[in-house]
Amino acid sequence: FLFRIIMANVFVNKKVDLTSDATTTLYTVPSATTAIIKSILVSDDSGSGSGITITLTNTSDAVFSIAFQKVIQANEPTEILTNPLVAETGEIIKVAAANANRVHVILSAMQVTPRTVTT
C-alpha cells in the first residue's frame, strides 16, 4: 500500500448582521484545518457610519487585534485585510460593532484540510 497525503481545499464564506454591540463570533477554524482568510468585508447600511473591532483569538485564549475601532463610512463597503490571513485549527475571528443594527460583515476563506489516500 502507498499512502499519500493530499490537501482538500474548500471555499467558505461566513456572514453576520451585527444587531447589537456585543462581541460576536464570526468564524472558527474547524478541526484539522488551516484557513487562509482572503477577505473580511465590512459595510454600514445606516447612512451614519459606524466603528468595528475585529480580533483573532488563538487556542491559548490570547486575543490579537485585526482592526480596532476601525471607522466604517456609511454606504461604503470596506475591505479590512490588505493581505491574506492564515488562521489555524481552533482559532476564532470575532467582531464587535460600535453601534447596533448598522454593520454587516462577510468573511471569505479557503479551508485546507490534509487527507490521507491509500493506493
Question: In which residue ranges do the predicted regions lie?
Answer:
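Short solvent-exposed strand-capping/beta-turn motif centered on an Asx-Ser/Thr pair
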Residues: 42-47, 98
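Short edge-strand/loop segments of extracellular domains
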Residues: 57-61, 112-114
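Beta-strand signatures of extracellular beta-sandwich domains
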Residues: 53-57, 106-108
